[in-house]
Amino acid sequence: FIRDAEIENLLADYSRPLFLAAGLNPNTVGIALINNKSLNAFVANGQNIYFHTGLILESEDPNMVIGVIAHEIGHIIGGHLSRKASAIDEAQRPALVATILGLGSLLAGAPDVGLALITGGQHVVQRKFLSFNRAQESSADVIALRLLEDTGQSPNGIIRMMDMLADQEILSE
């Protein structure tokens, strides 16, 4: 973690109208900086928003940061943290069944079937979780756009940030 009073105060100023529009008490939502060059922000431990310093440094203007704040608030009011844990549990059940069947097949002398069942079960978990994650991200984006509109702020920042993140993802592939 890194402490910077100026950045923390700016983030608090940017966040306040969004928190209020979302029905959140600004005094109960924590904001922290993580000394990391990546373009990332996330919600964890209830109502705490963490910003990587790389996201702050690479943002071309305050609207980009404000858009990210709105997106992260979308995760908070959408209850995405609590739903993620249950989604992981739900996705793991078929994998566990496939693993048990796969081990049974291995013990019965059918290694190809056993490995296919185990691998297939893991693949199903990955696909279910990625689908769930995409749905949460889309939901947070919709909430963010609504919050920006409700507070009279431009959506251009979040759109440009999405483009920047998409470009970064393409470059890393």
Model-derived regions: residue spans:
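Peri-catalytic and regulatory segments of divalent metal-dependent proteins
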Residues: F1-G109, V125-F132, S139-E173
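Active-site-adjacent, His/Asp/Glu-enriched structural segments that form or flank metal-binding
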Residues: I118-G121, Q136-S139
